[in-house]
């Protein structure tokens, strides 16, 4: 593959800049998230919006608490989780042509939304906050109070370059709480995050592949192990996975397929059938409902980035770059002023835990690593 092949999916007028960006990546030491990407590869969406992907199948989220026993509930948790992956990792290729670099949220940036009650499923609400800027960390809280299902977590990324691929280690976890109908009991599920590979850089058409393993561990001692593989040079299908639900080292159910396509039970299913459909990723996703920008607070994401996002969408990259620089310079000055006054930034919607005990207890059940991790919990709010 020669130099002439670099960025063949990139507009001709942008190819020189793309080639320079690739060289910058290859020689950069440290976390790539701090690099400034060429304008045409920027997304008009802030990273603080990404937790919304967890909620884009609100029916599946609400159904989790309807399982008749812990085994059925774990199957429902896995189904909801697999259902979130297409939105999280491939849907932007359809909507924007290829994976784009999201806007790096400012400290304290908020994203608030909801999925309305339909068919008596209950309303699902979302609160996300950028709780750290160096390194960038987003905390989120998703809740369907009627269904008794709540998800809380945080996510950060550590990125590096290898060959022609960006490797992304997702840092963080989520805790899913399920209140059991007719009792005061609740089940917890620790959800760890898969690592990512961003491929297709050479051609200027990046896409995401999942790699390695992730886990879902419940307080009922059930463990789901997910293994991800992608398309190799000679074999394999893109976006493939295998999930095994087990207890005490014994496999109970196995699901295989493509997380961006169709997956099926391998052998028996939870309903007693054989090789049944598990999930079809063409199932319609529901976008989160958000207040109009004019009604949003000054720290809400789409208000913060309104001019930048409009510039990116309209191809006016000069305006987008200028306003992005204005925002970032104002943030740097704000941090300096806070340091000088001895008044550090305070989280608005979340509390930071130096050691998330629920994570530690659940991770110990499957010898998960790291053994300890910090966490975030939503502050109680007065309505």
From Swiss-Prot:
Biological processes annotated in GO: lipid transport
GO molecular function list: oxysterol binding
Signal peptide: none
Highest taxon, organism lineage: Eukaryota
Entries under Pfam families matching the protein: Oxysterol_BP
Keyword Transport on entry: yes
Region (Disordered): 317-346
Matches recorded under SUPFAM superfamilies: Oxysterol-binding protein-like
Transmembrane segments: none
Keyword list, A-Z: Lipid transport, Lipid-binding, Transport
Protein task: Lipid transporter involved in lipid countertransport between the Golgi complex and membranes of the endoplasmic reticulum: specifically exchanges sterol with phosphatidylinositol 4-phosphate (PI4P), delivering sterol to the Golgi in exchange for PI4P, which is degraded by the SAC1 phosphatase in the endoplasmic reticulum.
Protein name stated in the entry: Protein KES1
Organism: Mycosarcoma maydis (Corn smut fungus)
